[in-house]
Each structure stands twice: as structure tokens, then as C-alpha cells.
């Protein structure tokens, strides 16, 4: 009998572990009802990712840990279901390099009300190895990475990347579990997917909280498809959707979760900017994965960018409770495109366009604004 694996591409609301946990528990209930054996959920699915100084608030961290415990406890009533989800992990007996309580960006695997472990760490969770510290990412400021932990334990970091064994209904699979950046091998000297495969992993699983950028999905396919082919085993990539604010910019998370075969070919993928569940079957005898899904047609770059802008603006307006918009229309291209975007989102009756003539704008731009 094949193990049924589901990838839950859910919307994560940064800073609302209560709402995120409620959604996770709902997906667990649905997984139980549909006979799912392993449910994958995104990185930092409980707290969200771009939180800034909220990561330094003890009460918030304690809330996230408590909600994580609620998810773990809920698996006791879910039969054989194993739930893998991302959350912050705290070791109050240790210090981060900033002197605060140590925090890890971690993956938890829960089954029968208990946590599963690969036996290589002093913790019952998987620690993220590669902490991005560029552009919008500031992980080194908040989290302690596996490389730092390996140095502290006087161990080789390569040896700490071991598969996690999951058994359900008498069937077993060894999962090579990674957190987001751990799979972006071209950026780092340590090839985590290959290490996991060398140490016996049969199926690679990457849980991510990865924001959209231009052509990023094409890069994902190239990178993760290559990793699966090189390792010679299938790979499941689980990302979230939603918007998150790092204090400077609002980022959209496009989802695009997918499954790759051992030959690196894309087997099935989830749509952009929509909650979805991908399902796959794992044949423990053949060591192969099977999906009944289809792959979506690739979008053009312009289509991807517009979809991202529209989704991000719409979700921001919804979260802020804004249903109407006033836009100053100059007669230039910027305000015209902005007007078109918000009319598409809110409808023409909910967008007021205002042109304010002065001695500094010409009759031509005033006419163009009126025509817009």
C-alpha cells in the first residue's frame, strides 16, 4: 500500500499564530478524513516569516511555542497522520549571539502526539542550516543556524544532515527534510540535498516560506529539478501564499508548490497565489512517487508581475479593511497604471480619480488625465 503524502499550500498571516494554527488544524482534520499519511506544511507556518523586532518579544515567542504544542498534541487524535510544519524553536538555556534566548528556524514532525527525531541533534526538531542574510532576509539577526550549532557541539555539520524515518500503516519512508534556503545549493558550499541522499534519504522534502521575485519560479524548477536528478530521488517543494511586511516592503508569497520525479522532471504543481493541496503516493517497495495532478502552463514575465502586484494590493486592502481608493491622476504613466490596477481590484465605482491643475502641469497632461 502506498503512503499518501499531501503538501498544504496555505496562506500564512505574519504575526498571527492563532489564525495560522487554526488553519493548520483544519488542514489536519481534512487530511485525516482523506486518509493522508504525511502532511507537509510551509516553513514558519505558525508565526510567519517577516516579523522584524517581533522576533525579540518573549510573549510572542511563547505564544508560538504554545500553538506548536497544540498542533503536536492534535496528532494524537489523527490516527497514523504525521504532520511536518515550520515553527520557531527556543532553547532558554542557551544564548543567541546577541545575548538573547536562542531561537531556531525549525521543522517539527509530529505523529501520535509526539515529535519524531533523526537522532543527530540534542533537540526533537530539525534546525535550518543556511540562514539567508541578503536583500529582504535578516535570519542571522534572529536565528541560530545548524552550522553554528555543529561548531558548538564539536561535530561536522555534514554529519548532522540525516533523514527522518516516518512509518504509517506498516509502510516506511526516509525523508530528507530541508528548510527553504537549505535547498538553494548554488548559493552555499554545503549541498544539503545530496548529503541527505547520501545518508539514506528516499524522498527529499523542502518546506519553504519563499517570496516572489521575477523569474524566481523558473529558477526554482531549475534548481530543485536538478537537485532531484542529481540525488536520484524525488523531491517535494512546499511553499506558502500570502503577503508579509519586513518593515520596509510588502512581499508577496506565490506558492507554486510542486513535486519532482527522481529524473528531475516536474510531475505536478500548485497554482500561483492560491491555497491548494498537492497529493502524491509513495511506493516504499519501488522507491517511487506517483501523482495524479497536472502541471500548469508557464506564465509570461509580464503576467507573473501583474498577478503579483494585483494579489499583493488586493490582500493588503482586505487586511486593512479598505474598500475604496482615491488616486491623484497627473496624466503621466505611473498614476495611469496605478489607476488601472486599483480599478481592476476594486471596480470603477470604488475608485475616485482626481486631477488638480496648477501652473506646473500643462494642458496636455490635464487632457490625458481626463481621458484616462
What do the predicted segments below correspond to?
Residues 1-328, 339-355, 360, 364:
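Enzyme catalytic cores with a strong preference for nitrogen-chemistry domains
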Residues 335:
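Catalytic nucleophile loop
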Residues 332:
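ATP/NTP phosphate-donor binding region
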Residues 363-372:
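Glycine-rich phosphate-binding loop and adjoining beta1-alpha1-beta2 segment
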